[in-house]
């Protein structure tokens, strides 16, 4: 059981403290918005990307655009700045179809480091084509800076309440692994129990057969002993006279 707990800790604890609500950015149709994501020093040489978050239970990427590339007909670009440990995502000519959740991530071995971002797009108006969105909504060019001294995953900066969301697979993977290990352990224990029970039943059956053979042998010896006299000779059985006849002895007449 102890190895299972250790494995569970290795899978869950590294990203457990980063599971919080996503940050929202917004803009009007036709606007250009940008956001910046920071990363730790050890992730400087890793590839950065921007993608649309898909999947209901397990998060996955669609329409991925890597650093130095342009996607969606040039409307999306990702520019990495290793000197400042941050990369910038620029979204041009927004449309209502662009609304949804996105991932700002860094490729690495195992699980990627990602930040979930919700993009809101409002219908454009002729009165203020490039004005700020309604009150209560974050500005289009919001910086999503995140640094951490305890973990390499994205965390909110001190000047912003941006929060980070880790893909649901980070939570489901340890659960599935633990369930698989518990199932394997249970099946092994059940198989061992059934094997021992079968051996005990087989041993009891063999013992019962031996007892029957031994008892039958003793009964045969007792029957044989009843036919012998104390000297070991066979004792003839007494013959009973036939009904209506006298014993079959020779008759002698006196002289």
UniProtKB/Swiss-Prot annotation:
Region (Disordered): 130-160, 206-255
GO biological process, one term: signal transduction
Glycan attachment points: 93, 125, 131-132, 138, 142, 146-149, 152-153
Keywords on record: Cell membrane, Disulfide bond, Endosome, Glycoprotein, Immunity, Immunoglobulin domain, Membrane, Receptor, Signal, Transmembrane, Transmembrane helix
InterPro entries linked: CD300_family_receptors, Ig-like_dom, Ig-like_dom_sf, Ig-like_fold, Ig_sub, Ig_V-set
Keyword Endoplasmic reticulum: no
One Pfam entry name: V-set
Disulfide-bond pairs as recorded: 37-104
Location, primary (coarse class): membrane
Signal peptide location: 1-17
One annotated GO molecular function: transmembrane signaling receptor activity
Record's comment describing the protein's domains: Ig-like V-type domain mediates binding to lymphocyte.
Function: Receptor which may mediate L-selectin-dependent lymphocyte rollings. Binds SELL in a calcium dependent manner. Binds lymphocyte.
Similarity comment: family membership: Belongs to the CD300 family.
Name of the molecule in the record: CMRF35-like molecule 9
Protein encoded by which gene: CD300LG
